[in-house]
Structure formats: structure tokens, C-alpha cells
């Protein structure tokens, strides 16, 4: 696929207007209580907003194009999947501002779509790692962090704005606009909107690739600030919509003459983050989130809805050469599926609660030891909601599983020189039975008996 940005226009508005502002003032640090901790080999890759801007990234494939451990497949946003060392995002723990991005609406589409313009930092951990990575991080974890108004304002600026227009030679346009400013000395507000219109692109031989045209719209609003000198709070809302005519399997190549089907994917996410920096013994971080996502379309015009909510509460204690992080997280997922027009036919519910502790100890200035443990409790239920021939529910009795798993990790990192580091580690990660693919719920739920079927020998991965 060839892709070239031929033209890009960016307009900014700020107050006060400072055209000759010195570089030193531009880089002036704003008030922040966020700590930066060196955690050894826990983070294999970190991408900053400056890196993303340098890449001129338009999607996640551009963001990770120079990351050998991470690849992104899929020619349209709805079909993009993230892979770490060949394992797709279903086996990763992906968070956006601490909100876990889980569950699968349809196994031929992705679960993570983000606008690069909103990203402040990305941390990637390849492979099973630390206890703080969250549940189910078999293939690793990716932590996305979004910008706020304070990140965009410089110096004494009180408000600002940006308008951006891009044209792609391979049949596409992108327009975005943002407004940001201070509500008070300690609070800021960021509003962002973008729209992308792509026609079918052409491959390297000039052949049109069918099923790659799509319209994407994104709205994002984030308020953030200090409720006290040592307490920070941010609240954000995001709404994303993507429409197009895709093949029966959007991430597959469309064969000549194959039909395309009108499809639409939607996602609404709400996140609240809180930080309390009391002392070296108490650095409290809390996240609460709720996500609703849906997909309608495909060959059979099916509709799948997933609702997710959860929280993560952790504290970090810094004692001499040792840093301890410990906490609890919880997530619950609910999926319903059925025809695009008609009653819901199948449903599943799943939850996981984790308790974790992770430590980093500087044995010597050159030697770092990391060690941790995580306990996860998994609960899963499935239910058939369809009626029989006479209008009587097939069954209202759910069937389920309840299991738990303990995971350990330990690692060493030795700084040989300024340019060379030697690392050694062992880590475990567990992934219990989760809610299924919304498209295939009806394929394995029922065997003709009175209750749904869950294999009794299913154990966490």
C-alpha cells in the first residue's frame, strides 16, 4: 500500500499571542505531581508526542512503524489489530488513560482505535511482565496516555486552538480541530474533533483495493486540574464512529465480484483519573472507567453490543532504594448479540478482580531487581435469550465458571555501560475465560439441552 501526504495545513490560535517566544519559555515545565519512576526492563518501548508528530502519524500503523516488537494489521480503522511479537490484541492488556480496552465485537475487526493527535505517551511491554500490567497480559501490555489542555498551552497562554487539514494522494482527506484553555489557574479544558474520509486506496501496482473506503468521526472532551496542591483529577469523554461498506470479513482482501455490506462501529468511553501525592509513603492513583461499543453489519446484518466498566486503585511507597506498588483492580464485561433488527438472542458476562504487588530495588547503583506477584479471580456466565417455537424462553438459567490464578515475576537489570544493559527475567500471566466474540456467541452456547454449555475443564491460560 502506498501512502503519501501531499499537503497538510495547520493553523493555531493562542492568547496571549507570542510569536517571538523563546525556546526556553516554550519548554517551561508546568505544575505537575506526576512522578516518573525508572522500572528497569518493564517498559521495552516508550513513544512520546514528539515522536508521533515527527512520524506524521495518521493511524496506529504509523505510530508503531518503527517499533520492531509491535505491528498493526488491517487496511481500515475498524479492521486494525495490534500485534506484539505475533500475538494479537486479544492477548494483550491495552489501556487508554488506565481504561482497559477489552472484548471482541467481531473477530474480523480490531478492538483498539485511537487518534494519534490525542496521544501524549505510549508505553509498550512485550511479553508477560509486571504484576501492575493488569489481568490477561499474556502477550504484553500497551498503555496509551492522552493529552490535556496543560500539555498544549505554553508559558502564559490562557487559551489556544488548532485546525489541521490533510490530503492523502491515496484517496483520502482528514480534518481536525481543537480548542483548549484554562478555566482557572489550576484547571484546563480540551475539546477535539476530527473527521476522516477515505475512498478505496490503490496498491503498489495501481489496483483499487475494494472495501477500504470508510468515514471516521471522533469527538473528545477532557477537563483536568488540581483540586488541591497535591491532588490531581481528570475526567474525559470520547465518542467514535466509523461507517463504510466492508466485506464479510473486513480484515481480509476482497475478491473481485465479492459483495460489500454496510457496516458501522461505535464506541463511547468515559474515564476519571485521580492522583494524591501525600508523601514518600503515599502516592495514590485511582482510575474508574466505562466503555460501550457496538458493531452492526456484515453478511447477516448482526448487532453486537459490549459494555465494560472497572477501576484500578494503587499506591506507591518509596523507601530508600526500594519502590513498592500495590493495589486492586476490577473489570466487568457484558456482551449481547442478535440480528440487527429483532430481539437480543445471546448474552455473556465476565469479570476479573486482581490484587497485585510489584517492587523495584536498587541493589547497587548498577543493579536493579524487580519482583512481584498477582492474584486474579475470574467469573464467567453465559445465557441464551431466544424463545422456542411456542414463544417460551429456551432457558433462563445461566451456566458459568469461577476460577483463580496466581502469577509471579522476577527480573534483573545490570547497567554495563551508558550504552549497554544486561537484562534477565521470568514472568507469568494468566487469562481466564472471558466473554466471547459477539458474532459467534450463538455457535457454541447451546447443544439442545435445557441449559447453556460451558466445558467443565476450561482453565485459565
Report the location of each language-model feature.
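Transmembrane beta-strands of outer-membrane beta-barrel pores
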Residues: 165-169, 195-199, 239-243, 290-294, ...
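Outer-membrane beta-barrel translocator/receptor signature
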Residues: 103, 118-120, 126, 131-204, ...
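Flexible loop and strand-edge segments within Gram-negative outer membrane beta-barrel domains
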Residues: 198-206, 210-216, 226, 230-284, ...
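Outer-membrane beta-barrel signature, preferentially recognizing the C-terminal barrel domain
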Residues: 252-279, 304, 348, 396-411, ...
Amino acid at each position: 500500500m502506498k501512502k503519501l501526504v501531499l499537503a497538510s495545513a495547520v493553523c493555531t490560535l493562542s492568547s496571549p499571542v507570542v510569536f517571538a517566544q523563546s525556546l526556553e519559555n516554550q519548554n517551561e515545565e508546568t505544575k505537575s505531581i506526576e512522578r516518573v519512576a525508572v522500572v528497569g526492563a518493564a517498559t521495552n518501548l516508550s513513544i512520546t508526542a514528539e515522536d508521533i508528530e515527527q512520524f506524521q502519524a495518521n493511524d496506529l500503523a504509523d505510530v508503531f512503524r518503527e517499533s520492531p516488537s509491535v505491528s498493526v494489521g488491517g487496511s481500515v480503522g475498524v479492521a486494525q489489530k495490534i500485534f506484539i511479537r505475533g500475538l494479537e490484541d486479544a492477548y494483550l492488556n491495552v489501556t487508554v488513560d488506565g481504561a482497559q480496552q477489552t472484548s471482541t465485537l467481531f473477530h474480523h475487526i480490531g478492538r483498539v482505535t485511537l487518534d494519534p493527535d490525542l496521544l501524549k505517551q505510549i508505553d509498550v511491554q512485550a511479553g508477560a511482565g509486571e504484576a501492575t500490567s493488569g489481568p490477561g497480559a499474556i502477550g504484553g501490555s500497551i498503555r496509551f496516555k492522552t493529552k490535556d489542555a496543560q500539555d498544549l498551552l505554553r508559558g502564559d497562554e490562557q487559551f489556544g486552538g488548532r485546525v489541521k487539514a490533510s490530503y492523502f494522494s491515496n484517496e483520502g482527506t482528514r480534518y481536525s480541530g481543537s480548542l483548549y484553555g484554562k478555566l482557572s489557574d489550576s484547571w484546563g479544558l480540551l475539546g477535539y474533533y476530527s473527521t476522516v474520509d477515505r475512498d478505496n486506496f490503490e496498491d503498489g501496482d495501481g489496483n483499487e483495493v475494494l472495501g477500504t473506503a470508510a468515514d471516521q468521526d471522533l469527538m473528545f472532551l477532557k477537563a483536568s486540574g488540581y483540586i488541591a496542591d497535591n491532588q490531581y483529577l481528570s475526567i474525559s469523554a470520547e465518542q467514535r464512529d466509523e461507517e463504510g461498506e466492508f466485506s464479510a470479513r473486513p480484515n481480509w482482501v476482497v475478491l473481485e465480484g465479492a459483495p460489500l455490506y454496510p457496516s458501522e462501529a461505535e464506541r463511547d468511553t468515559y474515564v476519571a483519573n485521580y492522583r494524591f501525592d501525600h508523601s514518600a509513603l503515599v502516592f495514590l492513583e485511582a482510575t474508574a472507567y466505562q466503555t460501550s461499543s457496538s458493531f452492526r453489519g456484515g453478511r447477516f446484518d448482526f448487532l453486537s453490543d459490549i459494555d465494560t466498566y472497572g477501576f484500578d486503585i494503587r499506591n506507591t511507597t518509596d523507601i530508600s532504594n526500594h519502590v513498592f506498588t500495590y493495589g486492586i483492580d476490577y473489570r466487568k464485561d457484558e456482551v449481547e448479540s442478535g440480528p440487527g433488527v429483532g430481539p437480543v438472542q445471546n448474552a455473556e458476562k465476565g469479570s476479573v478482580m486482581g490484587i497485585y504487588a510489584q517492587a523495584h530495588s536498587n541493589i547497587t547503583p548498577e543493579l536493579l531487581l524487580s519482583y512481584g506477584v498477582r492474584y486474579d479471580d475470574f467469573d464467567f456466565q453465559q445465557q441464551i435469550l431466544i424463545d422456542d417455537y411456542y414463544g417460551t424462553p429456551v432457558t433462563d438459567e445461566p451456566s458459568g465458571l469461577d476460577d483463580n490464578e496466581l502469577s509471579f515475576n522476577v527480573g534483573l537489570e545490570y547497567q554495563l555501560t551508558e550504552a549497554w544493559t544486561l537484562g534477565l527475567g521470568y514472568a507469568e500471566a494468566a487469562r481466564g475465560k472471558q466473554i466471547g466474540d459477539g458474532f459467534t456467541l450463538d455457535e457454541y452456547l447451546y447443544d439442545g439441552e435445557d441449559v447453556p454449555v460451558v466445558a467443565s475443564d476450561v482453565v485459565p491460560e
